[in-house]
């Protein structure tokens, strides 16, 4: 693993290369980015938010947001953390907030709706034109109707294809655990940006069982890392092998 003090520069170059190939791509370039403890925990338990990143790592993360077209989270993150999903701490444009919400549980008072210059897009498998959908559309939300996959979750492959049609060329995926796991399970991640806080939590893991071939797992390549305050930030390309 290469030690470097320009992880952000490497990420920007990866996005630039993806942008040059964007015309032929059928989905956005996906950056999976999240913070965890040294033992892989992202929360003490489900539904309970946990602040892990130091200020320097937060600045890094918000800079990362500013260079992506979209930012995606699951409805569990909205309900547990009520995040803004904006760029703060640094100058730059905020990405389009995209929420995977199979049954439209998105609350009308969510900060991502009330305090974001760009209205969120919600991907759901709910029947169209429900009362809840009409209320969100009236508030400015764009609803994307995506069917469930065979696991009973939003079909992420179809979602990404639709996002690409909507001019989302780069997508930052932040979580939570079910979203992280689903993107990895379906081989939809291009690069990983992992922030590790120097603490043990012993809580909910970021990645659940992937049901991949243990003898031919995906590999991290072109790895680089740097310290952001007290946190370690690691960046790598993900190489997917045959199942």
Q: Residues of each region from the PLM?
A:
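Enzymes that bind and transform nitrogen-containing heteroaromatic metabolites
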Residues: 1-243
